[in-house]
Amino acid sequence: KWLYDKIGQAAWACADPGVQFDTTINEWHTCPKDGRINASNPCSEYMFLDDTACNLASINLIHFINDSGHFNEEKFAHACELMTIVLEISVTMAQFPSDEIAKRSWEYRTLGLGFANLGTLLMVKGISYDSDEARSIAGGISAIMCGTAYETSAKLAKHLGPFNRYEHNKDDMLRVIRNHRRAAYNVSNEEYEKLEITPVGIDENL
């Protein structure tokens, strides 16, 4: 507890250090047949194989709140779909720091979609940042983004073909997607596949 208090205080004061849980990271790895995840970029939004990279994009959540404080899930999902397509196109246009990183990033077609302004959204809605309700909202928004991105990726793959290393990692990738779906529906721990530590599911009552 003392150590976590120190880490939490330091992260609040200057955004460092970050804590990464190696077992969990690699159990949610979509391409483990090609190697383990050893590290992330400094801000930790990108975790994947060594010598890969991706372009990042963040969707501003506050644009999906109306005057009454309601979050428009449909418009947000549509934005996630559009940005997934944009990032997919960007793979062939990006400038990478080395030929090896460019080659591997093309083989996996990695993209980085995220959101910004969660804190502002919660303030507008009058919800405490450190509350079960806030965590449920963050989980729900993440689930919509993740599910929409995977769905859009599948639609693109249907027309253009999957990324080069998909077949080699297909079973693991589909297992990870199934586990994401289970977390979104807050299933019992026994339903998860190959996880030592199961996630906290989304409580729809919050």
Feature locations, PLM:
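Catalytic micro-motifs at enzyme active sites that drive phosphoryl/nucleotidyl and oxygen chemistry
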Residues: I7
